Amino acid sequence: MIMKKLLITIWRDQVAPRFDLTSEVLVATVDSTGEVLTSKTVVLPSVSAEDLCHMVLTEGITTVICGGIEEEYFQYLTWKKVTVIDSVIGPYDRALEFARGGRLEPGAILTG
C-alpha cells in the first residue's frame, strides 16, 4: 500500500503564510485511498526554516503544504524528492481534505 506523509505549516486554523516563520505543523499519514491513518500537531521548539527542513527529512515527509516559501528552501526540498505545494491560502483542515483527494495544487485559495 502506498502511503503519503504530509506536513502542513499551520497558524491558528489556517495554512501558515510563511514557511520560515512557522512554529506549528500538522503531520498526517494518508493511505492510497485518501484515508488519514495518523495525524498529530507538533509545536516546534524554535522558528527556523533550516530546522523545519531537517524535520521534513528525518520524519520521512513526502509532501509539504505551505503558504509562501523562499526559493532556496523550495529548491532544497524538491531536490530531496519532497513534493512542495506552496502558496496555499485557507484553513489547514481544508488543505488536508483537498490533499487527501489529490486535488490540492500550488496557489490554491480554499474557503472555510
Segments the model singles out, each with a brief description of its role:
Residues 1-47, 51, 55-59, 78-79, ...:
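Non-catalytic interface/targeting segments
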Residues 62-84:
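Acidic/His-rich segments in extracytoplasmic proteins that coordinate ligands and/or metal ions
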